[in-house]
Amino acid sequence: FKFIEQNICQPLEEIKYDFDIVFHAASPASPPKYLKYAVETMDVNSIGTRNMIDVALKSKSRFIFFSTSEIYGDPLVHPQKENYFGNVNTIGPRSVYDESKRFGEALVSYFAREQNLNAGIIRIFNTYGPRLDPFDGRVISTFIRQALKNEALTLHGDGSQTRSFCYIDDLIDGIVSMSKVSEFGPINLGNINEISLNELIVQLESIFNKKLATKNLPALQDDPMQRKPDISKAQRILNWKPKVNLIDGLKLTINSFQI
C-alpha cells in the first residue's frame, strides 16, 4: 500500500489507482474545527466529494460517504429516522458543516441515480474512543481532558441537552458492514442509549471517583437539544448494533488519554 497526503479539493493527479472501495471521510467534524475552517469544510464536502466520486467512478468501486447526524439539525422528531428531513438553520454558524454534508448527500445521490455510482451513505452520530484528540472541542474529549487536569468542566447551557455516544470500534464495524452490501441508504450509525450532559458528568464522576466541578457558559447557537438515532434500518440491513456500553467505552478512552 501507499500513503498519499493530498488535498482532495485539488486535482487528484497522484491518485491513478483502481480501488475496491472509496471511504470518503475527509472533513472537520467537531464544531470548533469546522467553525474555524468554515470555507475548507464547505469545500471538502462539495468539491472534495465530487473529486472522490470521480475516483470511484473511474475505479468502478463502492463509494461510502461519511455523512452526519448534524444533517438533522436541532431535531423536532425523536429519535431520528433516516426519512426525517431535519430542522437546520441554513444561515447559522453550524450550517457550514450541516448544509455542506447535506449537499454532499445530494451529490452522491445524483451520481448514484444518473451515473450508476455504487454508493452508500452513512449518517454518523456522536462517536468517541481512544486516540480522540483531547483538544478537538467535542464534549467527551473536553470533559476527560479537564477532569484529568483537575479543571472545571466546561458546560454550555444547563446540561439537559442529550447525546447518544457510540464507541469507535462499534462504528468501524458498522462502516465495514456497509461497505460489504449494495445498500445506498442513508443509514444511521450510532448508539441508541441517550444521555444528558449532566448524566455524562455523573458517569465520569463515578469513574474518576471524585466530584467534578463545572463552569457554566451560555448555550451554543443551534446546538441540538436532543439527539438519538433510530438504528432499526442498520439492524435490519447490516445486522449491526453497538456492543460497547458507555462506562466501558469511557474507561478505555480515559486510559488512552493517560498514556
Where are the regions a protein language model picked out?
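N-terminal Rossmann-like NAD(P)+-binding domain of SDR-like oxidoreductases, especially those catalyzing
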Residues: F1-T127, D169, S256
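C-terminal substrate-binding subdomain of Rossmann-fold SDR/epimerase-dehydratase oxidoreductases
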Residues: K2, Q6-N7, N126, R145-I259
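Short aromatic-enriched loop/helix-cap "lid" or pocket-rim segments at secondary-structure transitions
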Residues: I15, P75-H78, D133-F135, L200-I201, ...
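A short, amphipathic alpha-helix embedded in the catalytic core of nucleotide-handling enzymes
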Residues: M52, F111, V139, F143-Q146, ...
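Short clusters of hydrophobic/aromatic residues that line enzyme substrate/ligand-binding pockets
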Residues: Y72, H78-Q80, L132, L153-L155, ...
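Residue-level signature of the cytosolic catalytic core of signaling kinases
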Residues: G92, L132-D136, N193, P242
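Hydrophobic alpha-helix immediately C-terminal to the catalytic Tyr-X-X-X-Lys motif of short-chain
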Residues: F103, L107, F111, F143, ...
